[in-house]
């Protein structure tokens, strides 16, 4: 079945009034005490508490979440002139592999955003540090010409016993969302991480996962819910507003995903067995749906390493069964000898998109006129507005530290 091209959608159709006081500036003291709005198309919204999730999912559900961990991506340097320069690390450049970059013990370079860039046209920035009892200087050098917001910065330090991961953990700040309108606080280092995060690389949290606690994970296990992991490193583009009038003029940001071969095989088996597939957060949704289209491209010999944003809407994308597409990924990995799929995705999920993998999703309430709201609308239809109106009238808290939804199709 061919999908309708959504490029003519006007983002204004997905705007809604969000009073500032409804934006949660901090999380609740108990993560799983937040509200959970449950909705299935054609039914009325139901109000629950997040801790009730095990009883709201069908036994046998495969629940898939994003194990990425937010890094302390903001590094603040001060020039000799007193000018403050902020370097926001986005993704590794050399080495390009996240794990290798974090393990570097002398130098590495990153693609960055630079705050107060006009004050740093040349020269080396220096930050004195002490990590693990070792005193040294961290140096930052621009390796691309000034003039554009995105820049490549090389970091150097003379402390071979200290890794770059340890440096940013000690010297950096957690990059909380700009719409919170506050500086990061010490509590954000814990609050803005999921309890199951362990793969470093994100500059924003997969916020639907913030509601889980170790005790809740245990109760999910007891309820017969199978928990599995994928990795998508969330980029700063997740906060970038849609500035174009039409979705077709919006350039979707690229994000890195890593998915184990054995999980992909198990997911194909679960789909064939008719088991419910639930995703925690839009990042897991984008990863799982990307897997399908990557599999189609691999089967057709058209895979290049990155999934373009409009591929799902092309007639040539075919109508392959979900499990068949997933097994095409497994076959590709077996042929290359890789145990993990490493890829980038630019997929945009918008109304008319046909979901291939995900049957339920846990997600927060998203910003007006955002691509994440398009993803939700593609899942539950135009009733998203009814659901959001209910949440606003019922006192739900919005955005990253806010309440959650459980949508089922």
List where the protein language model places each region.
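Surface-exposed, charge/polar-rich loops and edge strands
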Residues: 2-409
